[in-house]
A protein has these predicted regions:
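Primarily residues marking transmembrane-helix entry/exit sites
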Residues: 4-12, 103-107, 138
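Conserved glycine-rich helix-kink/hinge and helix-boundary motifs of the Major Facilitator Superfamily
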Residues: 12, 45-46, 84, 138-143, ...
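Helix-to-loop junctions at the C-terminal end of transmembrane segments
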Residues: 59-75, 164
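C-terminal transmembrane helical hairpin of 12-TM major facilitator-type secondary transporters
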Residues: 76-124
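Multi-pass alpha-helical transporter architecture, strongest
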Residues: 91-100, 178-209
Length: 209
């Protein structure tokens, strides 16, 4: 584990900050649809949930195939490289979607978000398993999920509430809070993944050799 600390740190930091942005977005978008477009909250949840269940499922399968394609091309850092590409796409999508003034375009963007979000869903477990010895995989994955989940679910949604109540001090600015959370968290994730590419490749080669 000491030999892979840079690699593991890049994965944990990337997915902790990315998770904060993702769960903030997932938690508050239905309420955003209610406040901005006067949707019934149950309809907002139904529409968003349906997009996640259908288009998101397609994205999850597509993401696995994309990873395998990149890996077969010789990129040993494929899990991090694929995740970085996905985060780069999600960054503008998540920053722009909450401030779109048209509900129909917003729904289309939520469809794009659902597909791309689930596209990277399996990347972090794959990344950890590929560089961890067999007898340590369960422990390392468990620690990763504990830390990432704590930040993602425990802190992510609260950031939006804090921005709305204390920064903007206006409930109608919820959309700006969601957007700002993505603007802050996702660049950290992308940078962490980028810095982790070379250490990850070294870690992968050590395990294989």
């Amino acid at each position: 584990l000491k030999n892979n600390k840079k690699t593991l740190a890049s994965i944990v930091v990337a997915y902790s900050f990315g998770g904060m942005a993702f769960f903030a977005f997932l938690s508050w978008i239905p309420e955003h649809l209610r406040r901005t477009f006067d949707w019934d909250i149950s309809n907002a949840g139904l529409v968003f949930g349906s997009l996640l269940a259908t288009i998101g499922s397609i994205g999850a399968v597509s993401g696995g195939k994309f990873h395998d394609l990149i890996y077969k091309k010789g990129y040993k850092d494929a899990p991090l490289r694929c995740a970085m590409i996905v985060f780069l796409i999600l960054f503008p999508v998540m920053a722009i979607t909450p401030i779109i003034p048209n509900s129909n375009i917003t729904v289309v963007m939520l469809g794009v978000f659902s597909f791309v979000l689930f596209f990277q869903q399996a990347m972090s477990p794959i990344a950890i398993q590929m560089i961890t010895p067999n007898h340590l995989r369960a422990q390392v994955v468990a620690i990763y999920f504990f830390v990432a989940t704590f930040f993602s679910i425990g802190i992510g949604p609260s950031i939006v509430a804090i921005f709305t109540d204390f920064l903007f001090q206006d409930e109608s600015k919820l959309n700006l809070s969601i957007s700002l959370t993505s603007l802050i968290c996702l660049p950290v994730s992308i940078l962490s993944l980028y810095l982790g590419l070379k250490p990850y490749k070294r870690s992968y080669l050590k395990v294989r050799n």
